[in-house]
Amino acid sequence: MYTFVVRDENSSVYAEVSRLLLATGHWKRLRRDNPRFNLMLGERNRLPFGRLGHEPGLVQLVNYYRGADKLCRKASLVKLIKTSPELAESCTWFPESYVIYPTNLKTPVAPAQNGIQPPISNSRTDEREFFLASYNRKKEDGEGNVWIAKSSAGAKGEGILISSEASELLDFIDNQGQVHVIQKYLEHPLLLEPGHRKFDIRSWVLVDHQYNIYLYREGVLRTASEPYHVDNFQDKTCHLTNHCIQKEYSKNYGKYEEGNEMFFKEFNQYLTSALNITLESSILLQIKHIIRNCLLSVEPAISTKHLPYQSFQLFGFDFMVDEELKVWLIEVNGAPACAQKLYAELCQGIVDIAISSVFPPPDVEQPQTQPAAFIKL
């Protein structure tokens, strides 16, 4: 009999994983403070990593990788992409971005030196001079100059400003209490018809204890309800596809898709009929490339291969597609929720791939085959 503890009661994904484990008859749930467990389904930000792997005779597995915030916090992701040898030169799939600290945090400002991309040595260095240099160059060249400011730890569409005025963006950040990222706004996204609407794509990615990377075959488009207008920055519903914003502010929420969600099968049909292309060839190939590059760049820093405990983690990668069908990474979520209709299959995949590979069911003699719902990258 294997044992597990649950330390995060708010995760709907791990509530379902917990239910599936108990249903096998091979797992027993212990009190959350019991140290003698095989599996910890923990809370993302307060995991006791230092205490894991020290129970004699017990293999211990936890559902997060220590250090994965390098990918999952917006400012850390920008720094990773600019400083990682694997990404800095070849990364063409991430919008131009700058890390800005509010002036009230008393952060040293990096001086601009004949260029836009700074070498980031001080992890708390503010990049506003580099942003302004790029902003002014674009203004002189007559390029599109819309930017978006986003709180590094923000979620659900909070702490966001879209503007074509550099001073407005910097003033907005300087009145906040935490680090922000200023990112070049995708002014010409691929739009859905009818409705001339924006969307983003959520892909779920599972990394097992051996750092094998699996992409969940199903993905979801989170769609806007209102027609897109690049010059109307005040109307968040045409710019931001977060469920919270669409549901609260758009009178057309649910008009085009139930819950403003479109799944890959329907999206593929749309691409085939509207653009004569397929999802796999035009978009998924790019998505797979970006996911691999991101996760492999942090592997040396977060892998548990030589630690006394083991990890796995589910990530949510969010993408946008521009009108040239180029895919852009927007952000990575380290504790993603899941569309309601996908819970059963996604969570069964977590059990089969990430948990049963470490703790095989005692009545299974043959090695388990990879679930068809996941693609190994």
Curated annotation (Swiss-Prot):
Its cofactor is Mg(2+); K(+). Its EC number is 6.3.2.25. GO terms for molecular function: ATP binding; tubulin-tyrosine ligase activity. It catalyses: C-terminal L-alpha-aminoacyl-L-glutamyl-L-glutamyl-[tubulin] + L-tyrosine + ATP = C-terminal L-alpha-aminoacyl-L-glutamyl-L-glutamyl-L-tyrosyl-[tubulin] + ADP + phosphate + H(+). InterPro entries: TTL/TTLL_fam, Tubulin-tyrosine_ligase. Residues 3-370 form the TTL domain. Pfam families: TTL. It comes from the Eukaryota. Keywords: ATP-binding, Ligase, Magnesium, Nucleotide-binding, Potassium. One of its GO terms (biological process) is post-translational protein modification. One of its GO terms (cellular component) is spindle microtubule. Belongs to the tubulin--tyrosine ligase family. Catalyzes the post-translational addition of a tyrosine to the C-terminal end of detyrosinated alpha-tubulin. Monomer. This is Tubulin--tyrosine ligase. It comes from Homo sapiens. The lineage of its organism: Eukaryota, Metazoa, Chordata, Craniata, Vertebrata.
